Amino acid sequence: MAAYASRWRTDCLLRLVFKKTRLSKQVCCEVCKASRGCSTTSTGHTSTSAPWPVYGRLVTHYDSLVHFGSLRKDPQQRTALLQLEELTRVLTDYTNIPILLPQPKDCLQNQPTSELQDKVGSRETVNICRPDENVSNEKEDQQEESSKPHPPQGYYIYGNVGTGKTMLMDLFYSFVENRRKKRVHFNGFMLDVHRRIHKLKQSLPKRRIGKMTMYDPIFPVAMEIAEETCLICFDEFQVVDIADAMILKQLFEGLFKCGVVVVATSNRPPEELYKNGLQRAAFVPFIGVLKEYCRIVSLDTGIDFRTREMKPAGRLYYISSEPDAENAVNALFEELAFRQNDVTRPRVLNVQGREVTLSRTCGTIADCSFQELCEQPLGAGDYLEIARCFDTVIIRNVPYLQLGMKDQARRFTTLIDNFYDQKVRVVMLADAPLDRLLDQGQMTGEEARDRLMLDELGLTDEASKRITLFTADEEIFAFQRTVSRLAEMQTEQYWISGDRSQS
């Protein structure tokens, strides 16, 4: 009877807490289960532990793939997996809900977004600034922080192109038995963050003279994401946009403090993120935050495993100067379209209220030109929508990509990154072989004008190298990854994995 009364009091207390904090129903249910000694697993069962031993399964599976020839043995990959395997064990019973529960009394910024929106809806004055004069409240918050459970450290895995980072991420993510996990491409994640920020700002009352208050939506957005997931896996963590660079520290500090575990892969070590970027000094503190909450693992094996001998899927890359190259691509489109239950027609995709027109499609096949995809003002969100609608995309008239074509080169790199991540099959008709598609030679007219401007400003060569606007370091670095990925996308294994007709 005493045990029953204790459980009843616990449930009443939790209901009172959630009435005040207004966390989501999903979060409330998970905390109630946790209070009864249960843990939620990805299979939907509730038990005191995972239904099978997790430790040992990940590396054993990797060893079996090596044994049967699916993967090539690599000591650095195995060492990284040993570390990730321990994290899979910890994450099985991990939840960040207890970290989200304590609410500071003096700072609306740390309240869930739903309560913030309720206050906005009632036209109450919103003030998220901590009172500087209330030192005692700050001490109380520090005590609350120290009493919170500490989340496990995440991982930041970096290395050259083709060293197996994405493969390790695939293995790790598939073996994590926690249904509150999420895997996203970094570009797509940041697009979603900016959408959330915009939506939150739009929900605020109009500013009036004399009633203006400072408001920063980044932390509420971080809390909103933390309510949805306790593990985020990022593939291709890269920072090239100043709008992203300026909010990363605050965003990720919020995620980490809300108990979100981050596992990321990147081609760059943390110190080289946003290298030569505009206003990089404001970005540098993020590197310290990343190192505090994530273990850094190098995977520089010096081997591009994507270029190893793999059975090709047939001819998928054509050079426009070759005889009958265009006819061959036309024939391939007709062959693929014949299997579709559709007619060849233009198609208009709606992306965030904008229209993206593709002139020639048939079912899940899109026949596009480089001009359609990379010379229009398109971004990662547009390419993700194309990847969602089509499993095979033909890209025609891909030119020599000169260093002066920064916008086109960046869009092309983003396009291939998103297609690769979504297993979209690509057929290309280009002006140059794949390994020579990026022309790093002759200076273009745009670059010549930039150089003249630098001379007129009296900037030294050393100073000019630090100005990302006039350099192509990021484009060259990113394009190496693009070439490696396109090489893998021409293999039979990739082509079969991208076929959605069987799904």
Swiss-Prot record:
One of its GO terms (biological process) is cilium movement. GO terms for molecular function: ATP binding; ATP hydrolysis activity. GO terms for cellular component: cytoplasm; mitochondrion; nucleus. ATP binds at residues 159-166. Keywords: ATP-binding, Nucleotide-binding. Coiled coil: none annotated. It holds the Pfam family AFG1_ATPase. Residues 130-148 have a biased composition (Basic and acidic residues). It comes from the Eukaryota. Residues 108-155 are annotated as: Disordered. Belongs to the AFG1 ATPase family. PANTHER family: ATPASE N2B, LACTATION ELEVATED PROTEIN 1 HOMOLOG B-RELATED. This is Lactation elevated protein 1 homolog B. It comes from Danio rerio.
